[in-house]
A protein has these predicted regions:
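Donor-nucleotide binding loops and adjacent catalytic segments primarily
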Residues: 25-26, 190-265
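Nucleotide-activated donor-dependent transferases that construct or modify glycoconjugates
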Residues: 2-14
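A donor-sugar binding/catalytic signature common to diverse glycosyltransferases
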Residues: 114-117, 258-298
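A nucleotide-sugar donor-handling region in carbohydrate enzymes
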Residues: 144-217
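Conserved nucleotide-sugar phosphate-binding/catalytic loop shared by glycosyltransferases and other
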Residues: 30, 34-92, 315
């Protein structure tokens, strides 16, 4: 029987594009007989190979820089607009050669569709192969770069690439994405499946805990917590002080979402992946404001309006009074509303017509 492939291009910017894509790939593996050709950065693919190792016989990987995203200043959350633009110019110029190489590699494969989250390379490859091409995201780089007044030629190149999408799977908290003119399907929140046995073990072993993350794309000099005696789980890139029970999760930890779900309070950059993991696990969420980032500001505004999160300024990380934060979270976050949301992982394959 001929192998049928789903080709998936995932942004190499940060890590949460990959983690939510892994949730979808898991379901493709469980619900269909498709093989998956996964293209992303070397760092992201290394994580994916380990996470999906039980499906190794149906996976093929290619390491490739698929996005620039937003470049941040050293040891901070602020976007370096000049450096972002500096890196985008040669990246856009490289698309033609990258797409040509991908088409040569894929042209003899039987392909069901091309998925992209949300690198323009996937949209361009799908168009060249003349197969259905589906975008998946809560934003595109068009509105992100417009917000920062990136060169118009760069923005037009992204618009042109996205114009080849046949369908767009829109995650929760989506920006308006006016440049997307294909049909859309609403997906909601999507995250990797939780291991409730592991979560129970973590709670028993560590007791009360916090989860602090700023994502793998940025580094923060220091976070200082005050008046807290529980365990603090942190991801790489953060130096946390103020507690003698700090556990830094290794960069290759496969299930940070289980540690998040075992925690009483989640303090994080307002990226979509961590938000989705927290919301679907019904966790009280404290988001770090980055007024310079359109997506983060939009996410925080929506979640606060819906009583699903509270926010703090980046400057407050120097002295986080945890009892005060917990009081604010208890006052302003509605557990009733939080419990209305669920992980759409098992529904997305059918929703996108892959089954």
């Amino acid at each position: 029987m001929e192998q049928k492939w789903v080709v998936f291009y995932v942004s190499s910017h940060g890590f949460r594009h990959m983690t939510r894509s892994l949730a979808l790939i898991e379901e493709i593996m469980k619900q269909t007989s498709y093989h998956v050709y996964l293209v992303s950065g070397a760092y992201q693919n290394e994580f994916a190979r380990n996470y999906l190792k039980k499906f190794a016989d149906r996976m093929q990987y290619k390491d490739l820089k698929t996005d620039i995203g937003l470049v941040t200043v050293q040891n901070g959350l602020t976007v370096d607009v000049e450096e972002t633009e500096h890196q985008l110019i040669p990246f856009v110029a490289s698309w033609e050669n990258i797409v040509a190489e991908e088409v040569v590699q894929l042209k003899d494969m039987s392909i069901k569709c091309v998925l992209t989250d949300i690198t323009p390379i996937g949209a361009l490859v799908g168009e060249r192969l003349k197969v259905q091409t589906i975008g998946l995201s809560n934003f595109t780089w068009v509105e992100q770069y417009e917000f920062f007044h990136i060169q118009q030629e760069i923005i037009e190149a992204f618009k042109e690439a996205y114009s080849h999408l046949d369908l767009f799977g829109e995650y929760a908290l989506a920006l308006s994405m006016e440049s997307v003119n294909c049909p859309r399907k609403s997906i909601g929140f999507l995250s990797r499946e939780l291991d409730w046995s592991k979560i129970s073990d973590l709670k028993q072993q560590y007791g009360h805990s916090l989860f602090i993350s700023c994502g793998k794309a940025v580094k923060i000099d220091r976070v200082h917590i005050e008046n807290y005696h529980g365990t603090v789980f942190t991801t790489s890139g953060i130096t946390v002080t103020g507690s003698d029970q700090i556990i830094e999760l290794a960069t290759d930890t496969q299930d940070t979402h289980n540690y998040l779900a075992a925690s009483d309070l989640v303090i994080a950059k307002a990226g979509w992946g961590t938000i989705s993991e927290a919301i679907t696990a019904s966790k009280k969420l404290v988001l770090i404001e980055r007024e310079s980032v359109l997506e983060d500001t939009h996410n925080i505004q929506q979640l606060k309006e819906d009583h699903l999160a509270i926010s703090i300024k980046e400057s407050e990380l120097a002295a986080l009074d945890i009892p005060r934060l917990e009081t604010r979270a208890d006052r302003d976050i509605s557990l009733e509303r939080l419990n209305q949301y669920s992980n759409q992982q098992d529904k997305v394959v059918e929703l996108l017509g892959l089954k």
